[in-house]
Every structure is written in C-alpha cells, then in structure tokens.
Design a protein with these regions (language model features):
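Active-site pocket-lining/capping segments in soluble small-molecule metabolic enzymes
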Residues: 1-103, 112-254
Length: 254
C-alpha cells in the first residue's frame, strides 16, 4: 500500500522511513497552514507547495527546485506546471474542489503525473472517478479539510485591532461548526474540525498514494494513525463520504 504522509512533526521522520512511507515536506516560503516547514536541501522525498504564487514566486520556485534532490512535488498553482515541465520528477496537482469529476481529472492528467481527487465527494463518486481516471490518482484518507486561505494575516490583524495577545493558531466555532486557523507571515489558513476520515477507501486500485495529512497531531498519534490506522482519541468524521455535498437549497433533502 502506497501511503503518503505530510511531515507535520519532525520527530516522526525516522519512524515513518522505516515503514517505507513516502514523505511529503511543506516547502519553506512556498507553503502555508503548517507548524513545520523545510528548506529544499532538507527534502529527499516529495515537497508540498500550496500557497498563492506571484510571477516572481514561481521564478523563485523554479530556481529552488533546479538543483534539488526531490522525487516529486504536490502543488495547486497551475503556473507551476510550466515552471517544472523540464524536471524529471513526479508532478501531482491538487485541485481540491475542482477535481470532482473524471473528465476534469483526465484533462489535467495530460499535463501532470497524478491529481488529488476532491474530498467533497461520496465514496461511490470517488470510486467511480478512480475507475475512469487514465492515470493513478491520489486519495486523501485522513486530514483536516482546508476551508480557505488568505494572504492577509487575519489572526494577527484581529489581535492587533482589539489589543489582544497574539496567537498564531486559534480554535474557534460558529454555532456547531468548528475550525482551526493558522497564521504566519505568508497568510492565514482555515481548517474544518474534526478530522476528515476516509480510511475505508484504503486498498482501492488505480491509486498512486493514500494521503495522510496529520496536522496538529503529536508523534504517537501520527505513528499509530499512519502505521496501524489507529484513530483512537482523534475526533473524526466522514463528512461527505457518506452523504452528498449540499450545493444549493434544493439539495438539502437530496
């Protein structure tokens, strides 16, 4: 089984390497929403690029990757496709909400090696896409689901305006909806809480990687989750896996 894990805690690296797990490192300056980032010379597996990039940023990324030893890259900015087209590495596109049907996925697969299938879908919809995709795809099986990303420092600005002690990570809720927000110099990322649990999708065919994104979990929980699929004491939910996404009022009773 091809498990891919975002490195959100440096203490787990050696343990996961012993289990032949593929590691995905958030790349310093080109990534947001994490507690830990890595310089390119620290990365010997896959790197993650998930922030909004300017023309200058893409040129900087191209230069950064040119002499690297990475095996592949996960990214969500389409401009990166052109910047890395001559690099002999695996190229995986993260389209999130857009990668929700096999036609869109197969179109983009002409330009990249794989695509992360949207987690806004039911189990049946995901299985159908996988069966019709012309290349192996990536499936998110455990993660905090990203809600939004702003290049503004929303948390810092809020604390400054109200003269509150600054925190770069906050837990908040609106009625019965909970989320976690992470702030750093490159912007603010919001995640839905609890964790998205799609572990029942493991062992499907035509899958390049099963992606675990264990942000905010401690070392022991990450090891148990990734190696044993043990989610004891980790709040989780299937979200849309067993119910359709509500797009409009008419869908509420669908």
């Amino acid at each position: 089984m091809n498990k891919l894990v975002t490195v959100t805690n440096k203490e787990v690296i050696s343990s996961l390497k012993k289990e032949n797990v593929t590691l995905l490192y958030p790349l310093q300056f080109f990534c947001v929403g994490y507690e830990t980032y890595f310089n390119i010379d620290e990365i010997d597996d896959y790197c993650l690029v998930n922030r909004i990039l300017t023309d200058e940023d893409i040129e900087k990324l191209k230069e950064t990757l040119s002499d690297s030893h990475i095996k592949g890259i996960f990214f969500d900015d389409l401009g990166v496709i052109d910047a890395i087209k001559d690099l002999n590495i695996k190229k995986v596109l993260i389209l999130d909400h857009i990668a929700a049907n096999y036609r869109s996925i197969n179109y983009y697969l002409d330009y990249v090696d794989s695509i992360v299938v949207s987690s806004d879908l039911t189990k049946d919809e995901i299985e159908n896409i996988i069966s019709l995709a012309k290349k192996e795809v990536v499936i998110s099986v455990f993660s905090l689901k990203g809600l939004m990303y702003s290049r503004r420092n929303l948390i810092k600005n809020y604390h400054t305006y109200y003269k509150l002690p600054n925190e770069n990570i906050i837990n908040a809720s609106i009625e019965n909806k909970h989320f976690i927000a992470v702030d750093d110099e490159l912007g603010t990322k919001f995640y839905a809480y609890p964790y998205y649990n799609a572990l029942e999708l493991l062992n499907l065919e035509n899958v390049l990687f099963y992606w675990y994104n264990p942000i905010f979990l401690d070392k022991d929980k990450i090891i148990k989750l990734v190696i044993h699929n043990d989610i004891t004491n980790i709040p989780n939910d299937k979200l849309f896996l067993d119910k359709k996404t509500i797009y409009k009022v008419g869908d509420i009773n669908a």
